[in-house]
Regions:
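Short, structured secondary-structure boundary patches
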Residues: 187-188, 205-210, 245-250
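Catalytic core of nucleotide-sugar-dependent glycosyltransferases
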Residues: 191, 195, 202-227
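Membrane-proximal basic amphipathic "stem/tether" segments
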Residues: 220-269
């Protein structure tokens, strides 16, 4: 099958080459690359044309990454579709091959796996993220690694586009729709994608948490007090983590992260 990989770009000249290179070196070659560019003013377009001359490229004004992704999904001709952000990259050359081989069973609706966060400034890897899909776990906190989700195009069409009224958490909303359905999946154990930590500021975290709370209440209004407990607990924990980092007590954060998830949240739900 053909696999469509959608990348939204905006002044991504510093990072897009590594993203494209990671696609070009994939062992599986039946790939459709789609770039949706928000009228970049740097060399982003030039790099895309040089490194991915056969790619589908659209450069026009949009209102954010999720509107761009929706445009890409509409254009996609592949039977399987997914995204690769402009500052992220595939971790090895067999990622797409592993994705496609997972769909050899016609009953499979989507594939997902793990990501590895990295710091662009240092190049150092930070930590893994992503676990087997679970609606219950995702209602506590985002647990499915959205960048790794590659889905049958017909399933995406059934679920509908990203709700781009959410600035940051539209992927959370879309993943909840996916998990609320009875869809069959394959979870890939080996980390698939390196994801940049850039831009994950405390301010963005707060907005993301607020949007996630609103999304949860949209689907489960009867659980309002439970979700509010989770929201305030996680927000205070994030503030404490940021303070520890500012005080250069990063080792404490690393120890806490090691034990993250050991205490069950299921009693709250």
């Amino acid at each position: 099958p053909k696999i469509s990989i959608i990348t939204a770009t905006f002044n991504s000249a510093k990072t897009i080459a590594k993203t494209i290179e990671s696609v070009n070196r994939q062992t599986y070659k039946t790939i459709e690359q789609i770039f949706i560019d928000n009228q970049s003013s740097d060399d982003t377009i030039k790099i895309i044309k040089a490194m991915a001359p056969r790619a589908l490229l659209v450069s026009e004004k949009d209102n954010g990454i999720f509107e761009a992704m929706n445009k890409g999904y509409k254009l996609a001709a592949g039977e399987v579709v997914g995204t690769l952000n402009s500052d992220d990259y595939f971790l090895h050359e067999r990622v797409v091959e592993n994705i496609v081989s997972s769909f050899s069973n016609s009953d499979i609706d989507y594939v997902c796996g793990r990501i590895m966060f990295f710091d662009h400034a240092t190049g150092n890897f930070s930590h893994y993220f992503g676990q087997k899909p679970s609606l219950r776990d995702n209602l506590v906190r985002m647990s499915i690694a959205h960048p790794t989700v590659y889905v049958q195009k017909e399933i995406f069409d059934k679920l509908g586009p990203y709700d781009d009224s959410y600035r940051i958490a539209a992927d959370f909303d879309w993943c909840l729709r996916l998990l609320r359905g009875d869809y069959r999946y394959v979870f890939l154990e080996d980390p698939m994608i390196a994801v940049s930590l850039a831009g994950l500021s405390a301010r963005n975290y707060r907005l993301a948490a607020q949007e996630e709370l609103a999304i949860k209440l949209k689907y489960y209004p009867e659980r309002k007090w439970r979700f509010q407990i989770i929201y305030y607990r996680d927000y205070l924990a994030r503030c404490l983590r940021d303070w520890l980092l500012r005080m250069k007590l990063g080792k404490v954060v690393q120890i806490a992260r090691r034990f993250q998830g050991k205490v069950s949240d299921k009693s709250i739900l």
